[in-house]
Amino acid sequence: MKALKALAVATLGTLVLAGQAHAQAQQPIKVGVIFPLSGGAGPQGQHVTQAIQAMATIINESGGVMGRPIEILSRDDESTPAVGVSRANELISSGVSVIIEGWNSPVTLAMQPVINRAGILDITAISKADPILSGEGNPLAVRLNSSNSQDGAVIAKYIADSKAKRIAFLTENDAYGNGAQEAIENELKKMSYAYEKVAEEKFPFNQADFRVALTNVRSANPEMTIAINANEGLGMPALIRQAKQSRLPGQLVTAVGTVAPSVISVAGDAANGVIGADIYFPDVEPFASNEANKKFVAKTQEMFKYTPDKYMALGATSLQVWAMAVNEVKSLDKEPVANRIRGGSFNGTIFGDVKFAANGQLESNHKLFTVENQKIVVRPVSN
């Protein structure tokens, strides 16, 4: 009788443990997402968050991550470093396995050491400042968007190819904006390209009135004005409209990745003729025929009635690559997942077959474009 009781207790214990293991296996994996959801960049941050939710749905429909569903926990950083740090701490306390963040470089740079100390993988989707990958705030940093250095080479080449000599800068006065301008000028110097910087105007991220700055630039009679403004919801559309109203001479060239369809929608006809460059266009090859991209675009349109732009694609790909890495290394731990991504290659992403540099930077292909009839028209590749 005692033996039977012992066997029954042991069997019950085994069943309880098995039930607990099964319950744990079915518990969602929490993914933290931090972007501006209010203020000037709020609309874009909301779109990026929606894109990540669309990708989470695609992943969950395909079996999830290590057999578990993904749950997205989203927070608003309000484009403010201190708020971003607070939101990061909230997500850390909530038990997230990874945090996908980064619209504004100053916010990303403030959050990095906090997330790193918590032992959680931090993936920067969009913020561009070069120090993000310096290793100071996060020795295992990963970034999807192109860097200021990569972008600077693209804009510098366009300046040189255009043979423009009188150059003006309208630059956001923070880590992103100053770094972007510095990268362009450094590349021009490397090319030994002779030019004159006829005007330079700096402004804060939240500025929306550029009339005084544009008056100063206009009086310098530039052949080309480089506009560096990451406030796509408010600042960049306002700058484009006011540049048109001021009859700014020469070409208006925008920093890489700062003119999306949402910017053109707000700027209206004033956007026609603007030059820009980017790394993703949903309906242009090689993206148009990419099955992973087609699936992502269709799911985003189904869920949110919106065609994704570059920012949304970067957010979704951040989650997609993380999920691929976790499923491969079979661990949620920061170090093995980060080491799989940094210096690694991934096939079948939204961006196609991709490769990350050893420092965590996704390698990108840039395309120049012109805005015509309020549409982005990709320019032919020049040698």
Each language-model region and where it sits:
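Extracytoplasmic "Venus flytrap"
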Residues: I29-A51, R75-A82, W103-N104, L170-G179, ...
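Bacterial N-terminal signal peptides that target proteins for export
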Residues: M1-A8
